[in-house]
């Protein structure tokens, strides 16, 4: 009897250890702070829009010159993921107004991004597709895995008490929302429909699965 009780106690201790080890609510910020962070990141006015256009131009140059370092720099400053998290927040909190506002805002960001990239590639003297451009035209299952993992990590980073964490920059690089849109601009500028469809499909995959992962994590945090 004592032996059985000892086993049950050990099991309970293990459950407690694992629960604490993988808890996402233990060091979470308050709901008010989470809301403020996510909605601020999803704004399409002021600083966010200026930064987005700069990021698009930087990413376009990087893709056009086949420079991985420049592309990474553009992904680090891109605000696109903020809009996806804001849409997800509106979904989980059952706020139709937030969902609509940030969905429209995200669509505007996409249009401006593609238009900016198209103008750049129309003016660029380099017309040949680089390795980095072509890499954004063939989405596969691994892109889905990256987007899901990135969405989970991204929302966890946004909901921590400590804002000064290194999660968001890493997620921005991993999920790569900006380069596919720039590739769409290249495809439009050069009349390449197949490349346009492939690049936009990759962008949709990334955005959708980041959204799904964010929904799941926000639900678990009980926003």
Task: Give residue spans per PLM region.
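Alpha-helical transmembrane segments and their membrane-interface boundaries
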Residues: 2-13, 17-147, 160, 164
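Hydrophobic alpha-helical segments
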Residues: 133-208, 213-217
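Conserved small/polar residues in nucleotide/adenosyl-binding loops
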Residues: 221-223
């Amino acid at each position: 009897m004592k032996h059985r009780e000892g086993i049950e106690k050990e099991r309970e201790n293990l459950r407690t250890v694992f629960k604490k080890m993988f808890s996402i609510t233990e060091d979470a910020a308050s709901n008010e702070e989470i809301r403020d962070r996510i909605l601020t990141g999803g704004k399409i006015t002021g600083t966010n829009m200026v930064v987005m256009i700069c990021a698009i131009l930087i990413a376009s140059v990087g893709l056009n010159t086949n420079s991985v370092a420049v592309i990474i720099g553009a992904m680090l400053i891109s605000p696109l993921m903020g809009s996806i998290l804001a849409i997800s927040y509106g979904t989980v909190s059952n706020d139709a107004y937030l969902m609509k506002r940030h969905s429209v805002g995200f669509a505007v960001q996409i249009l401006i991004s593609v238009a900016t990239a198209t103008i750049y590639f129309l003016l660029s003297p380099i017309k040949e597709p680089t390795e980095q451009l072509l890499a954004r035209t063939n989405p596969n299952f691994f892109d889905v895995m990256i987007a899901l993992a990135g969405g989970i990590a991204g929302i966890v980073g946004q909901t921590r008490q400590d804002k000064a964490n290194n999660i968001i920059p890493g997620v921005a690089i991993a999920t790569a929302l900006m380069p596919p849109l720039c590739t769409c601009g290249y495809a439009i500028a050069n009349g390449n429909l197949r490349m346009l469809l492939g690049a936009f499909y990759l962008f949709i995959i990334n955005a959708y699965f980041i959204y799904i992962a964010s929904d799941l994590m926000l639900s678990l945090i009980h926003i």
